[in-house]
Structures are given as C-alpha cells and as structure tokens.
C-alpha cells in the first residue's frame, strides 16, 4: 500500500492586510481567503508567492526544478487574466520579495533591488553583505501621509578597541575623524555601500554636488603640508617618550594577565544594527543600534512609524521610533533563549505579536511610551551582559513596567486547559515583582534599570502540538515555524463563548456601543505554520490573558 505524503511547504505568508494567505509547495502555489476561509487561486511550481493586498497582482519566483522556473527569475502575474505582466532575471537566487502600492523590493544574498511597481523601472540598488535568512521589511500603507521605509540588518562591522571583545556591548562609540563628517544625500542613481562605520557614495568619480574631487584634493594637500610641521614636532616628543614607554610595557604585561588590555588593540565584530532606507527619497536615513547579537527578526508597522526587532537570543524585543531612532518600548518575550520566527504589528499599532520556536505566541500591548534618556536609549545590551549574581534573576525576569499595570487593571482571562504549577508560580512571581519594580528601579544603576523596565506579554496562547495540516516543512532542529498577523477588530456574541466571557469579570468596558449588550469587541490574531495549518485566535483587547481559538483549517487538504 502506497502512502500519500503531503507536499513540502517552500513558502507561506500573509498579504499586507492579513486578509489572504499565499502558500507555495512542491506541487504548486495557492491563495486562500482568511475570512471566510477558502482557496480561490492556484498554480504550480513556485517557491515564493507575494501578494499586493487583495489585488490580482502576484510576484512569484520559480522553484528551480525547470529552466523556465529559475530561482533567479521574478515573474509578475495577473491572476484575473492569467497572463504574465513581465519577467526579470537577477544575477543570483531571490531570497525575498516585498511590495506596496509604490515600490517592489527584491532581496538577493548580497544585493537589494528597488523598483517602481507602476512601470517596473529600476530605481536603486543597495550593495550589502550576506543576508541568508532573507530578513527584510517594508512599510505597506498606501497613504501619502505615511512613511515608506525599508528596513534590513546592517552588515557586521569590525572595529578596533582597547576593550577586550568579551567585555564589549553594542553601544560602543569609537571617536574618529570620519564620524564627524556629514555624508551628503544619495542620488537615486547611486549605490549604497555600508562598510565599516561610513556610508560610501560614488558616482562617476564626482561627489554628490557634481564637483570634481580634485578640488578637494588640492585643499587637502595644503592641510597635509601644515600637518607635516606638526609631525616633526611630534617626533621630538616621541623620542623623549621612548624611555617611559619601556617602563609602561612591563606594566601592561601585568594588566594583560588580569584580563585588562593595556596598549594592545583587539578587533571587535559589531552586530545587531538595523539600517532604515527611505523608499521615496531613495536615501538611507539612519542606523539603529537594536541589539548586541545578530538580528533574527524585524518588522515595520503598517504606517512605517515603528520598527520592532529581535536578536538571535530571542529574550528581548525592542520597538523603535523610525523618525528619531529612539527606543520607545522594550518587552521580555521569555527567560530562556529561543528562535523568534516573526514579529507583527496590529494596524493601529496597539499590539505586537511574536512567534517563536517555543510554539507560544506572545502579544505585547503598546501603551505608555517608555521614558528613556539619551544614555539609556543606547544601552541596548542583552540580558547576558550583566552579572546575574548581583541581581535576583527571578525578580528581574518577571518585572513589568507601569505601562502594563494600567492595562491589566482587570484580571486577564485564564485558559483552564493551560493551568500548570509553573504558570501559577510565575503569576504570583509577576505580581510580587510588579510591586517591587518602582523601588528597584530607583536603587539599581541605569543599566540594570533598563532591564527592570522590560514589560512582560499582555496576552499569549500555545499552538496545538499536533494538527491536521500534515505538511513536512520544518525549521532548524525539526521545529515547526509560524508567522502571525492581526485582523480587523470584530464583534462577537459573548453567549457563544462562555468560557471566555462568563468568568465573573466586569466586561462592561468592552461591550459594543450597539443596542445588543451581548456583542463584544475582540481582536483577531491569525497564525499560519509550516506544517500546513491556519489558526484563528481572538484577543480581549481590555483584559488580555489567554487567547481563544475560534477556528482551525488545513491549507494543504482544502
């Protein structure tokens, strides 16, 4: 008897509004509607399928099993007329494709191509280093009043420092003459090379203002002549200092034995930065120092005003203001390291969802903006940069900020099926730690206070351990990957879900303004996983707590 194995999932994603799902398998690709759930389009042999909202335009990339379906070829398809609009071939395999109503962005391993989606004209090319995971995000809002940004991880930077590499954090600032110079804006025809700490812009051997670099060279020669006189004077001083340097060399050896570097420099690799690129002006705007470790996931909000990031460690999630680069929220996803698969903002920027290898989806509420000084804003070190022996780890990992306390004035909903001893202990620990947060924040220094202000999740739910999807596409170590998105706010009849609404809680603040007092406003959260399952959960925006599973479908057998 032959066993009919389900196809391997190569790609799965939501569209910009979360109303549709695109999935590509070895057997082809399909487009599903989320509400009501159902398939409405399918074709074969594609590895990437990107939608433009709910329009008939699709950007697809071949699976590579046939010459006509190369992984280097991007094809724009009109699903209404079943016609090919255009095809573009690139020098290497395509890792990701992102679209909004003005721009199309294609990510290769070491290049990013930006097109005008209206006429498919190439506007700009960005040279970068290897981005194997295809981590990239663009803002999707079609409104001209909203920002249109591209965000992607910055290439690693190697810097020389007297501080040993195992003692460094991500907020080291190296004073250099080049850092004080202001870079000119980029021309749309220029390429951007992010190398080291500077942005190199070259166009036909001329500077951006069109003047030849030779004029600048003449001025530099005059400065060099003046500097020669100073160098001669310095040589005399250096000769006098040779004797004292010999004495310092013997002292530096003793410092090196104790782990402190004296005069020798060490090379430090600086990771965890994110580059913001303006898709309208075609200019990079800033580099945000997000984490100490490499970036694992990032996303821009729908209106392009917020950026959320997570590192490979996965314990801390940070949210930044795109205009200023300031860190405005810091959330603690968990205590133990895990791989974060995706981050997603709600359309109104009130919630942020994170999926990870732990199979628990965490929802954070973006309420009161965190008050940070300029020094604290640069203090983006992860938890392991502090000595856990100096801090009660049970208190630190469970503290919540005042912004969460107000939103949890009502007891959150608790799913009785998830009741465990560990959850009971964690809940009591969180209640005690919230009461101590204010006092501890005043006692500990600034670096520790930055950790104390990290907020825990507002709501969460655990994905089912088994599903009916049957897909065999998994992540590293056999983990099932998942991505999330928020739907539009809906109204539900509370009498149909007594396990959520009828637990003796005061729900009058969440009752709709309509005449029917049973209607409740709820926030849908949609999840698709690499095993071929689609989950539809709802979140109580006032109480939080455990989310309720409304429906579940297989996107492979439908």
UniProtKB/Swiss-Prot annotation:
Stored InterPro entries: PROPPIN, WD40/YVTN_repeat-like_dom_sf, WD40_repeat_dom_sf, WD40_rpt
Residues spanned by motif L/FRRG motif: 331-335
Coiled-coil region list: none
Bias-annotated ranges (Low complexity): 210-252
GO biological process: autophagy; protein transport
Residue span of region Disordered: 176-264, 400-432
Pfam families: PROPPIN (PF21032)
Ranges: WD repeats: 4-42, 290-330, 335-374
Membrane topology: Peripheral membrane protein
Compositionally biased spans, kind Polar residues: 188-201, 253-264
Keyword Membrane: yes
Signal peptide extent: none
Keyword Repeat: yes
Comment text on domains: The N-terminus might form a beta-propeller domain involved in specific binding to phosphatidylinositol 3,5-bisphosphate (PIP2), leading to the association of the protein to the membrane.
Quaternary context: Component of the PI(3,5)P2 regulatory complex.
Protein name (record): Autophagy-related protein 18
Source organism: Vanderwaltozyma polyspora (strain ATCC 22028 / DSM 70294 / BCRC 21397 / CBS 2163 / NBRC 10782 / NRRL Y-8283 / UCD 57-17) (Kluyveromyces polysporus)
Lineage summary: Eukaryota, Fungi, Dikarya, Ascomycota, Saccharomycotina
